[in-house]
Amino acid sequence: MVSFTVMEKEQKLRALMQMMGLRLHWYWLAEWAWNSLLTLYTSLLFLIVGLGGEVSFMARSPGTVVLLVLLHAQSLVFLAMLASVFYRKTTLSFMVNSFLICVFAVTGTMLTIAEYTSKAFPTYYFLCAPLAYTRGIYLLTRWAARGAPSWAQLEMQNILGMLVADMIVYLFSALYLDAITPRQFGVSQPPLFFLRPLRRMLRGGSLDSQAPLSYADVDEHEDSDVSSERLLIQELVAGRGGSVAMGSASSAGRVPHSTTVGSTAESSSEELLLESYSLRKVYRAGWLRRSRGDKVAVRNLTLGIRSNECFGLLGPNGAGKSTAISMWTGLFAPTSGRASICGFDMETQMDEIYQRLGVCPQFDILWPLLTVEETLLFYAKLKGVPRHLLAQTVEACLKGVSLVTTKTRRIGRLSGGMQRRVSLAISLIGDPSIIFLDEPTTGLDPETKRNMWTLIGLAKPSRCIVLTTHSMEEADALCGRIGIMAYGSLRCLGTSLHLKHKFGDGDKLDFTCRPGEVEAGKACIRELIPSGQLQDAGTALEGGTQCTMRLPSGADAEAVRLSELFRELDDKASDAGIIEWALRQPSMEEVFLKIARASEVEQEKLKHEETQKKDRRVLNV
């Protein structure tokens, strides 16, 4: 029982179920029901064999035996729930619990033999259900052999009563400790979380008692578009008295008009479905609150994403993309900062957020023994899809990800690409308001990848999609705005075209000259574009030599009319020895590499400055 519950935690299955709308009390109710069926089966088998075989101690007091066995079985269910809170690894839980079962059985027997043969156990011993059960079996065997003294009858009543008390203690302890214990995956509650309804009532429906968030700790090298986005979110936060939006979906922030074209939201009528304000995540290297080995995964991320938008979050490995999504989806608790999704505060209203959330995690989280259809049906029910629409919804999802022919196959028998499509289908099921897609097309072939792009594009209207990917082509094709992260910070922000113009190396004209006519071709291009810059001497190809000229930018760009340039090239290219030519715009890959390299240089500079500071401190000492 314990191992299965821990396995769901370890493999993030429980976390994904929560993200898809499962309330924890329903989760524990399902665990109790399933484990109760298992223990009831074994208990009934034990009773049938014992009573049918006329075992002496069972035949003498059958009613007491049945009550003892069933109460003990039920107490073990709640004890298993409590024990599962303290484990993160399935193997460890199995080994430790197997050992503890033996210890409890031996301890109860040894205590009875050594000291309590003819007198009652102290009642507090029975807070441990296995000890109470062991003692109860001893008393029953003693009754069968020598009769039941009055102290033994009273002790048996105490045992039965304490087993009931144990169930209550174990249940509430499990629910409370599970809520407040720090989790490997998921956000724990504060110790007094159960007083939240009282606080809400006293504060007139609001839980937000924090002071306005600080605007400090701004990167001195922050990009202008990132600064505009931060100021936009600050304006919204200041308008609400220093708190993120919370309370209901209708309270999501309205986007004021932005003067920065291509970077922040452009329409004053659209809602921000995601507001992230100074979000920060630090992985501690030790037990102390701060140490030199701390790793800052996300550094003061301030961002707003609106409805009807597919936002691309790019960056090299370790940039903080997946960590940011993990915080937004409640998988990791932020070290500091605030965020709201669909108008609900991430710190206090995650249950409401989960009802409106769809998640495709970076790595597939699936039950290998379920079929594709069963998996989608399960999550459709979690999302509250009406019963009469379940079959229709599942069939639509199967068609969308092209898995209709494999719907009866178990997940464990699918290829990695097919499992990825199942994860994408799960994120889209139930019509969520905001969808997080963490590298959704990893491992897919080109044709399937294009189909998934179409599916994601169709899902964009009336909702917000946050996409991370290492494919610049995918980001270009799907995303209205793109943000690039490096070393935990948001380095740039804007539409694909805006970023290409701002960080790209300018438009380029590639032209191929016939062998021996390279200089004539270059002279022709220089005549047509006097302010252009030839990039290199040329690259030898099979049919000639390819050269590249960078077109002028800024004020000089106005002197180059592309329509006239194309007409002149059509007229003069052949006479100048130019075989073919093509205009090439900056790619997102160029922008990505430029941002990544600049961030590396900046990071090396910071490390060098830190080293110099340490050296000066050592010299001063």
Regions found by a protein language model. Give the residues of each.
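Conserved ABC ATPase "signature" region
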Residues: 377, 381, 389-406
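Conserved ABC transporter NBD signature motif
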Residues: 329, 337-345, 352-353, 357
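Catalytic Walker B motif of ABC-type/P-loop ATPase nucleotide-binding domains
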Residues: 435-438, 444
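Hydrophobic anchor residue at the start of the ABC signature
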Residues: 424, 452
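Membrane-spanning alpha-helical segments of multipass transporters and channels
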Residues: 1-13, 24-25, 29-211, 518
